[in-house]
From Swiss-Prot:
HAMAP family: ATP_synth_delta_bact (MF_01416). It comes from Mesomycoplasma hyopneumoniae (strain 232). The lineage of its organism: Bacteria, Bacillati, Mycoplasmatota, Mycoplasmoidales, Metamycoplasmataceae. The gene is atpH. F(1)F(0) ATP synthase produces ATP from ADP in the presence of a proton or sodium gradient. F-type ATPases consist of two structural domains, F(1) containing the extramembraneous catalytic core and F(0) containing the membrane proton channel, linked together by a central stalk and a peripheral stalk. During catalysis, ATP synthesis in the catalytic domain of F(1) is coupled via a rotary mechanism of the central stalk subunits to proton translocation. This is ATP synthase subunit delta. InterPro entries: ATP_synth_OSCP/delta_N_sf, ATPase_OSCP/dsu. It is found in: Cell membrane.
Amino acid sequence: MYLYKKNYYGYAESLLDISISENNVEKYINDCFFILSIIQNNQVLILLFKSHFIGKQEKFNIIDKIFSAKIEKILVNFLKVIAKNNLFLYYKQILLKYIKLANSHLSQTWGEIQTAFPISSVMTSSFESILSKKLGKKVHLRHKINSKLISGIRIIVDNQIFENSLFSELKLLKQNLKKHLITKNDL
């Protein structure tokens, strides 16, 4: 397992070197998020690309058909290399490692803003600005609808959670009630 980990980190580092040399790091980050989204929403692609019953050329054709018109050619070829070397099972780790390395290179970070309803890009930009000042680096937020929130927002950046939602208030109330009941039962 360690060998694979070392290999896919090497793939991510190589992709970073290429994106830096092309002065296109930000575009590659966005393309990586696009790839992650497409594959996440079409899990059958993972089975297809890791299958030994489907030929390499057929896999390459599928990659071309899905991604060629939407992402940088280098990234299309990068996906083909991963498929060719039977490492597609690790596509997510490779792309996430690239994003992490690229963000470090650009002195920025990415996070997720979750709401129970759609919000405007102006509001998202406002949160990005506030968090950038608070964290001391450029913050980019991707929006996600989370129906469990009921109302309010949750922002996750660098493993930190900033939350103000009815869901979190109910969760806190439940914990306090449990604590109160346990204390009352101990008397």
